[in-house]
A protein has these predicted regions:
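Structured mid-to-C-terminal alpha-helical surface segments
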Residues: 1-146
Length: 146
């Protein structure tokens, strides 16, 4: 019990596999913690490729600057062949037709939310223009996106 402190709240999001199917094999990751001693435990989690495929899908259906930032950040960390293998199903499941021009048309909406959404999460937040242009070039280079 912690009588002097507010209760600890933990949010757990359980999504049905029929709504958000995992298409790529999960990976096992060691739990990193700030305490001394070896915990020696790992957890099963989404692969970076699954996360990247989800981020690419979601950027075409919602306007959250975090998705653009994450896509640009994950580019060098993911196997794009695996990402591209999952994308057609990711789009189809949600009924999304990825349209790069429509994404560019939402530029001002992304820009308006950039600082308020991210500056409290990312210490050295890069400029919106730089990240947005990099993201558009990257996505425009993918064969699946028109």
């Amino acid at each position: 019990l912690r009588p002097a402190a507010p209760p600890i709240n933990i949010k757990i999001d359980l999504t049905l596999p029929s709504k958000e199917p995992v298409l790529l094999e999960a990976s096992r990751r060691e739990i990193i913690h700030p305490y001394s001693g070896d915990l020696g435990a790992s957890v099963s989690c989404y692969s970076l490729e699954e996360i990247m495929a989800e981020k690419i899908r979601t950027v075409f259906e919602r306007t959250r600057p975090r998705d653009i930032y994450d896509i640009v950040s994950l580019r060098a960390l993911t196997n794009m062949d695996d990402v591209l293998s999952a994308l057609p199903d990711k789009f189809e499941i949600k009924g999304i037709e990825p349209d790069i021009e429509e994404l560019v048309e939402r530029r001002n909406t992304f820009a308006a939310a950039w600082n308020n959404s991210l500056r409290h999460q990312i210490a050295d937040l890069p400029s919106f223009d730089e990240v947005f242009e990099t993201c558009i070039q990257f996505l425009g280079g993918l064969e699946l996106i028109k």
